[in-house]
Amino acid sequence: MFTMKKPMLLLFFLGMISMSLCQDERGADEDDGGEMTEEEKRGAFGDLLKGVAKEAGLKLLNMAQCKLSGNC
C-alpha cells in the first residue's frame, strides 16, 4: 500500500502544478483578449500526461525488475 501512495502523491502534485500553470496562462490570455484553441489545450495536456505516464511506467518496471531479480 505504501508503494502505491508515492506515485499517487506524485501524480497529484504534478496535476496541481499543471492546473496552476493553466490558470496563469488563462489569465494571460484573458488580458490579451485572445483565446486558446482546443487543439493547443489538448496538445499541452497530452504531452504532460504522456511524460507522467512514461515516468510512472518506468518506475513500476524498475520496481518489478528489482523484486524479480532480488537485487533490491
Curated annotation (Swiss-Prot):
Residues 23-40 form a propeptide. Disulfide bonds join C66-C72. Residues 1-22 form the signal peptide. Antimicrobial peptide. Active against a variety of Gram-negative and Gram-positive bacterial strains. Not active against fungi. Shows very weak hemolytic activity against human erythrocytes. It holds the Pfam family FSAP_sig_propep. GO terms for biological process: defense response to Gram-negative bacterium; defense response to Gram-positive bacterium; hemolysis in another organism. The keyword Disulfide bond applies. Belongs to the frog skin active peptide (FSAP) family. Brevinin subfamily. This is Brevinin-2SN4. Expressed by the skin glands. One of its GO terms (cellular component) is extracellular region. It is found in: Secreted. Keywords: Amphibian defense peptide, Antibiotic, Antimicrobial, Cleavage on pair of basic residues, Cytolysis, Disulfide bond, Hemolysis, Secreted, Signal.
